[in-house]
Regions:
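Class I (Rossmann-like) S-adenosyl-L-methionine-dependent methyltransferase catalytic domain
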Residues: 1-70, 77-131, 149-156, 160, ...
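A conserved beta-strand element that flanks and buttresses the S-adenosyl-L-methionine
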Residues: 141
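Hydrophobic adenine-recognition pocket in adenosine-nucleotide-binding enzymes
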Residues: 145
Length: 220
């Protein structure tokens, strides 16, 4: 498969200035953010979201697009890797109430503070060792997640996605196309440990035999 497709084209775009934030972030801020605890989700903007709360305006249109693109229905099994508090999972469940929707996240805080409808569907685990059987899911999604792993674990996470999905998967990772984009990404990055150009990501896909679809997050 391996299609480059922007499945988040309906997701609201941030208008925050990239370089201004980069001038303020310290390595201590990054270290705090990479714990993926309260400071990351509900602390200061320099260490994360500055308050990660549910709003239907973020995911409603995007999950409808994903549903149509992959022809999902009430018999589908869907996995969200890096699901955080389960907001996308929740909106998927509203749209496809019969689907089996699971989430994985490394953050105990995210699960403990997840939206109530999805809390029991979230497993605290690492993407490089997914606690599911082979070929279980009809769709596996990992949006802005795998790049938070060290390179060796990131590669293994792609192999795990191949293992647990029957056919379909979609990943989005930090990337750049040119030198300006690279500098903006370095300024913007808070949690990513594996980030590279689009061309280098595509070489990695070949190395791990990633079979799914993909797109990029650009710091623009």
């Amino acid at each position: 498969m391996k299609r480059e497709v922007n499945l988040l084209k309906f997701y609201p775009q941030s208008k925050r200035p990239i370089d201004d934030r980069g001038n303020l972030i310290t390595e201590q801020d990054r270290a705090i953010a990479r714990k993926f605890d309260v400071e990351y989700f509900d602390g200061d903007r320099l260490t994360g979201y500055g308050g990660y709360n549910y709003s239907p305006r973020f995911w409603t249109d995007t999950v409808a697009h994903i549903k149509d693109f992959y022809h999902l229905d009430d018999n589908s099994k869907i996995l969200d890797i890096g699901c955080a508090k389960g907001y996308m999972m929740h909106d998927l469940s509203l749209l496809i109430p019969g689907a089996e929707i699971k989430g994985v996240d490394v953050s105990n805080y995210a699960k403990e503070n997840a939206i109530e409808s999805m809390q029991d569907n979230i497993v605290v685990a690492n993407a490089n060792n997914l606690p599911f059987t082979d070929d279980y899911f009809d769709l596996v999604i990992a949006i802005n997640t795998l790049h938070n792993l060290p390179l060796i674990d990131c590669k293994q996470a792609f192999r795990e996605i191949n293992r647990v999905t029957k056919n379909n998967s979609f990943v989005m990772n930090d990337a750049w196309r040119d030198a300006k984009g690279k500098q903006s990404m370095l300024n913007w990055n808070l949690t990513a440990l594996t980030y590279m150009s689009c061309d280098d990501w595509e070489e990695l896909f070949k190395e791990v035999d990633y079979k799914g679809d993909y797109y990029w997050f650009f710091a623009e």
